[in-house]
């Protein structure tokens, strides 16, 4: 055990699985003597040096193979005196290289051969590593069938991994021929990568006692739902039921609720507050606009006996004298909540809205502030960014996850991909909608001019709109007053020129047109969020994707689909799997081998094996 720990420390990794992924060989150097004199083979030859010739910047050393009685040329480009000194006429030595044949004179050649003093083994080649030899020694001490089994690796997978890290000449030849590992070995690496990911998730699944187990507020919940002027969807009801079970538990819950744009997650948030009553709820939103929006929704829909407070950065001091008093049932705020020094012991539930907009440390800090004597508050994290089914499959055993797919009011949004020459179509529709007292947002790819991007910037394009329309507002992420600008636009504006800062959560009831410039530069998830701002209150909506590209299959497919969960699947076809991971859950924040779009069977296999092993170790597995 001590030896294993020392080896892991030397390799700067925390587990054998991590070592397998960090130090997967990127190639091999077969230092065995060549068995055949055949082009395309790499290996060691014993050669005798016959003569040397200089050709401009090329040094040719004429030699012969002592074993195969064949002449060959050793070629160095941009050679130096060092190469002359290494290869002396009349001497014999061992060299490593790849045997090739010249297309000019059919001579056998080895380009840039290396002199070998020790041979008879296969060296592993690692990416971005200095001491290859030492790392290989430590790895091969660490990796064994026994150690792999201890990590939960199945025997058939373990044998494939052993072939990767203890390769035979035949295996190396296959690797060089295919320029990659054979498919079964690649699948073994995928298995290990997903197993490593799941083990990391399991480490985060620590159970703590709930600081406060909430009462069963079934009657109060029924009254709240009955008071709403609309009917909840089946998905909303299921989410509320799952949360109700969580809140009454003596174990602190941590649940991720993922909903599509416009799925009505705000009503689920408010129902959670009702279920927590008379205990307190703390809700953190990423921006003042969203916090105010949630605050107004709470005032509108929560029962009149609820006392709701709002804490923003600007109003922090003003409200600090009476905020968090016993009478308050719900506190809604921004990151200003993280800097409040008051005792949060009475808060039974902590909610984070648009959770992906916060770092892991920020979410943890809020939870920690509301913890007491080792017991934690219940925690709900809401996100309006759907994730692919395969990623949900991997997470579901370790993170309680609820999906809200149904949309209360199906949106009527027409999405068109247009070339800049067709911009007159956009202008006509904008004029029509403004005449109806509707609103328009134009999203620019960047704030200031850039030679690298063939589109106008926000600052360059503003004058175009200001000359043609009234009530044009401009803002960006760099604007200190952006939230005030957006609020003023919501009340009295016609056109808002902005960057993607308006991507998430903001409710603009009169917004009917979204124009996105350079949409090819944005991920489909971002495009879906932007489009989701349109048609919030039953208006017919229009989303124009304005590009300089003649064709873009990705954008055309996006235009034909409104379902955020299907778009998340579509996104996998065009993005690396790692782009969908957030919060540093997987080393390097990306999967190198697993393809979330294609490897559902492997993910399901790993999950099944992992849960079976875990239940056996607890003595709870049943056949």
UniProtKB/Swiss-Prot annotation:
Which GO BP annotation is one of this protein's?
Answer: DNA repair
Q: Could you tell me the EC number(s) of this protein?
A: 5.6.2.4
* Keyword DNA repair belongs to the record: yes
Q: Matching InterPro entries, A to Z?
A: DEAD/DEAH_box_helicase_dom, Helicase_ATP-bd, Helicase_C-like, P-loop_NTPase, RecG/Mfd
The entry describes its oligomerization and partners as: Monomer.
Explain the purpose of this protein.
Answer: Plays a critical role in recombination and DNA repair. Helps process Holliday junction intermediates to mature products by catalyzing branch migration. Has replication fork regression activity, unwinds stalled or blocked replication forks to make a HJ that can be resolved. Has a DNA unwinding activity characteristic of a DNA helicase with 3'-5' polarity. A deletion mutant does not display the same phenotypes seen in an E.coli recG deletion and is not affected in DNA repair in response to UV light or quinoline antibiotics; however this gene complements an E.coli deletion as well as the endogenous E.coli gene.
Name of the molecule in the record: ATP-dependent DNA helicase RecG
Annotated organism of origin: Helicobacter pylori (strain ATCC 700392 / 26695)
Q: Which gene encodes it?
A: recG
């Amino acid at each position: 055990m001590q030896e294993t720990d020392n080896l892991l420390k030397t390799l700067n990794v925390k587990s054998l699985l991590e070592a397998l992924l960090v130090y997967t060989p990127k190639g091999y150097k077969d230092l065995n003597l060549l068995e055949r004199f055949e082009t395309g083979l790499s290996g060691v030859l014993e050669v005798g040096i016959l003569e040397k010739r200089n050709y401009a910047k090329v040094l040719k050393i004429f030699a012969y193979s002592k074993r195969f009685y064949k002449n060959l040329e050793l070629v160095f480009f941009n050679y130096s005196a060092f190469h002359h000194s290494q290869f002396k006429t009349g001497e014999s030595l061992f060299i490593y290289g790849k045997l090739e044949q010249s297309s000019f004179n059919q001579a056998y050649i080895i380009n840039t051969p290396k002199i070998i003093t020790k041979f008879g083994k296969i060296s592993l080649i690692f990416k971005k590593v200095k001491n290859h030899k030492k790392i290989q020694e430590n790895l091969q001490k660490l990796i064994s069938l026994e150690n792999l089994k201890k990590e939960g690796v199945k025997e058939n997978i373990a044998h494939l991994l052993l072939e990767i890290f203890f390769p035979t000449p035949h295996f190396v030849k296959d690797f060089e021929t295919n320029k990659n590992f054979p498919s079964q070995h690649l699948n073994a690496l995928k298995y290990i990568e997903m197993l490593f990911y799941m083990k990391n998730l399991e480490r985060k699944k620590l159970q703590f006692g709930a600081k406060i187990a909430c009462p069963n507020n079934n009657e109060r919940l029924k009254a709240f739902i009955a008071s709403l002027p609309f009917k909840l969807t089946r998905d909303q009801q299921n989410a509320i039921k799952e949360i109700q079970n969580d809140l009454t538990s003596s174990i602190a819950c941590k649940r991720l609720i993922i909903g599509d744009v416009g799925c009505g997650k705000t009503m689920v948030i408010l129902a959670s507050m009702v279920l927590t009553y008379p205990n307190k709820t703390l809700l953190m939103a990423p921006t003042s606009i969203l916090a105010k929006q949630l605050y107004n929704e709470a005032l509108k829909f929560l029962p009149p006996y609820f006392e709701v407070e709002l804490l923003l950065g600007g109003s922090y001091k003003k409200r600090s004298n009476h905020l968090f008093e016993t009478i308050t049932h719900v506190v809604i705020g921004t990151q200003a909540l993280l800097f409040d020094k008051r005792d949060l012991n009475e808060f039974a539930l902590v909610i984070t809205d648009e959770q992906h907009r916060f770092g892991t440390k920020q979410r943890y800090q809020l939870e920690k502030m509301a913890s007491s004597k080792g017991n934690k508050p219940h925690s709900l994290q809401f996100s309006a960014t759907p994730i692919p089914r395969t990623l949900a499959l991997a997470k579901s055993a370790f993170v309680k996850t609820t999906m809200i797919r149904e949309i209360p009011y199906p949106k009527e949004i027409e999405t068109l991909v247009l070339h800049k020459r067709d911009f007159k179509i956009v202008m006509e529709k904008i004029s029509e909608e403004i005449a109806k007292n509707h609103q328009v947002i134009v999203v620019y790819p960047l704030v200031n001019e850039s030679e690298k991007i063939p589109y106008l910037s926000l600052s360059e394009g503003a004058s175009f709109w200001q000359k043609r329309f009234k009530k044009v507002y401009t803002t960006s992420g760099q604007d200190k007053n952006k939230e005030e600008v957006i609020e003023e636009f919501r009340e009295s504006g016609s056109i808002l020129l902005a960057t993607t800062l308006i991507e998430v959560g903001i409710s603009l009831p009169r917004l009917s047109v979204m124009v996105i410039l350079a949409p090819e530069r944005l991920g489909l998830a971002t495009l879906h969020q932007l489009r989701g701002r349109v048609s919030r209150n039953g208006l017919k909506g229009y989303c124009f994707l304005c590009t300089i590209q003649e064709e873009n299959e990705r954008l055309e497919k996006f235009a034909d689909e409104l379902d955020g969960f299907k778009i998340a699947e579509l996104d996998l076809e065009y993005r690396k799997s790692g782009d969908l991971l957030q919060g540093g859950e997987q080393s390097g924040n990306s999967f190198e081998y697993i393809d979330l779009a294609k490897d559902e069977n492997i993910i399901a296999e790993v999950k099944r094996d992992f849960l079976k092993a875990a239940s056996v170790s607890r003595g709870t597995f049943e056949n």
